[in-house]
């Protein structure tokens, strides 16, 4: 049976394999590149906002942030108004590789959209956003029963 989930999973697996290959020398894997890019494009973002933007759980975000920090690509600065929160920034090392990571991302987006009209891409994105919203609505019905 055909389903959005099956095709989404295949796209995810194939793209992750390409990302892993292209970013191997930087020691940034498919599990971290999206976190890296969001931080690069939104320096000062909080860890919570980072996870929210990527639709991932707190523990997943924490692991990715810790990995990128350990590799020297990002740093965390405590928020003055509330010491419980940290803002995330690229380090000099992170800034040095940022263009390369963004280039790989752009290259893979080009592969995704090869021979597909822009109008179809935009429509597909709108459909996928609706699917995500539907899933979030369903998840909210079970507040407290999912791990976040």
Mark where each language-model region is:
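N-terminal leader segment of winged-helix/HTH proteins
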Residues: 1-26
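Charged, amphipathic alpha-helical coiled-coil/dimerization segments
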Residues: 16, 67-126
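Short alpha-helical "packing" element that flanks the helix-turn-helix/winged-helix DNA-binding module
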Residues: 32-36
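Short, locally clustered residues in the helix-turn-helix/winged-helix DNA-binding domain
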Residues: 37-41, 102
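Short capping segments at the starts of secondary-structure elements
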Residues: 42-46
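Residues within helix-turn-helix
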Residues: 47-48, 59, 66, 86
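The alpha-helix within a helix-turn-helix
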Residues: 51
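C-terminal regulatory/oligomerization modules of transcriptional regulators
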Residues: 119-148
């Amino acid at each position: 049976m055909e389903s959005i989930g099956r095709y989404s999973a295949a796209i995810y697996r194939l793209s992750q394999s390409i990302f892993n290959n292209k970013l191997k020398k930087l020691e940034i894997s498919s599990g971290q590149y999206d976190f890296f890019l969001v931080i690069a494009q939104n320096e000062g973002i909080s860890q919570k906002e980072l996870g929210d933007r990527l639709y991932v759980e707190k523990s997943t975000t924490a692991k990715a942030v810790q990995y990128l920090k350990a590799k020297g690509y990002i740093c965390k600065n405590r928020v003055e108004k509330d010491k419980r929160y940290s803002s995330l920034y690229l380090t000099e090392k992170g800034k040095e590789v940022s263009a390369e990571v963004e280039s790989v991302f752009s290259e893979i987006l080009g592969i995704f959209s090869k021979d597909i009209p822009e109008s179809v891409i935009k429509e597909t994105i709108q459909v996928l956003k609706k699917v995500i919203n539907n899933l979030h609505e369903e998840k909210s019905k079970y507040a407290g029963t999912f791990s976040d």
